[in-house]
Amino acid sequence: MKIGVIMGGISTEREVSLNSGREVIKYLELLEHEIIPIIIDKKEDVMEKAKGIDFAFLALHGKFGEDGTVQSVLQTLDIPYSGCGPLTSAICMDKDMTKKILKYANINTADWVNVTNAEDIDYEAIEKIGYPVFVKPNSGGSSVATNLVKNKEGIKEAVELALKYDKEVMIENYTKGEEITCCMLNGKMLPVLAIRPHAEFFDYTAKYADGGSDEVVIELEENLHKKVEEMALACWKELKCEVYVRVDMIVKEGVPYVLELNTLPGMTKNSLFPKSANAVGISFAELLNSIVKYSLEVER
């Protein structure tokens, strides 16, 4: 099978995507597929460079990659691809929309408000949410332009920074607890990982620098494990996920809260999904093979 590994892109996460793509290529080649590296530098590249491939493995992150646009183009071209479809991808990229659906489905998530203008910040609403808060681009990823703000004085500057990366900014209550991530493969949860950043939170450096955080497989207390698994599965169903996603949560006083869903989780040597799969004996090559297999089974 001729597999095109699509990477790069035009988002702020381009370098992360290129790293994912290189790792994916290295291990897919072990499976004896014909691999075509496809580096995206501009939007039109998808139409031009994807011609002639049998399957697209998406190693993209961020806008024009994780937001359903590339998925829509590939569907138009009748090229099967890895991961979730356009609708789920678009919704999960929009943190505000994701949280609205979670709230509607009675799935725990931290309180938040969104703003589109640094001059129209509702400080009373933020006060009700309670400080400290995270201020971040609504559709951003990899914690780019994400700041922990501890009082009213720091809000405007953080909002202005986030607006440089997105037209909408989320201000979300900082729920202090243990950060965990649940990797879902074909609707089943792999072992839970605890994320223990060396910084105050799991920022860009903690995510991608060697030694930026400790990510360890943990065995949750039985009752909590059941709650977490049920919540991850509810997210999968409510947001109509397919093939694989990563559900990030915070556990506070025994109660899990969903932070966000990643429809194209990172695939670098530091990535969480391969670590979780490895804990049940699934090698990186086997994981990639499963993603290709399950993706081909999805009716688009």
Swiss-Prot record:
Answer yes or no on keyword Manganese.
yes
What Gene Ontology terms for biological process does this UniProt record contain? cell wall organization; peptidoglycan biosynthetic process; regulation of cell shape
Cofactor dependence: Mg(2+); Mn(2+)
Q: Which residues bind Mg(2+) 2 per the record?
A: 260, 262
Residues binding Mg(2+) 1 are 248, 260
Which protein family is named in the record? Belongs to the D-alanine--D-alanine ligase family.
Highest taxon of the source? Bacteria
Q: Which InterPro entries match?
A: ATP-grasp (IPR011761), ATP_grasp_subdomain_1 (IPR013815), D-Ala_lig_Van_CS (IPR000291), D_ala_D_ala (IPR005905), Dala_Dala_lig_C (IPR011095), Dala_Dala_lig_N (IPR011127), PreATP-grasp_dom_sf (IPR016185)
Which pathway is this protein assigned to? Cell wall biogenesis; peptidoglycan biosynthesis
Q: Which organism encodes this protein?
A: Clostridium botulinum (strain Loch Maree / Type A3)
A molecular function annotated in GO for this UniProt entry is: D-alanine-D-alanine ligase activity
Q: What is its main location?
A: cytoplasm
Kindly list the places in or outside the cell where this protein is found, as annotated in its UniProt entry: Cytoplasm
Query: By its UniProt entry, which HAMAP family does this protein fall under?
Result: Dala_Dala_lig
- Tell me the keywords, alphabetical order: ATP-binding, Cell shape, Cell wall biogenesis/degradation, Cytoplasm, Ligase, Magnesium, Manganese, Metal-binding, Nucleotide-binding, Peptidoglycan synthesis
What does the entry's cofactor note say about binding and number?
Binds 2 magnesium or manganese ions per subunit.
Q: Is Ribosomal protein one of the keywords UniProt gives this record?
A: no
Give the protein's recorded name. Answer: D-alanine--D-alanine ligase
Its EC number is: 6.3.2.4
Query: Which reaction is recorded as catalysed by this protein?
Result: 2 D-alanine + ATP = D-alanyl-D-alanine + ADP + phosphate + H(+)
What gene is behind this protein? ddl
Per UniProt, where does ATP bind? Answer: 126-181
Q: Name one Pfam family in it.
A: Dala_Dala_lig_C
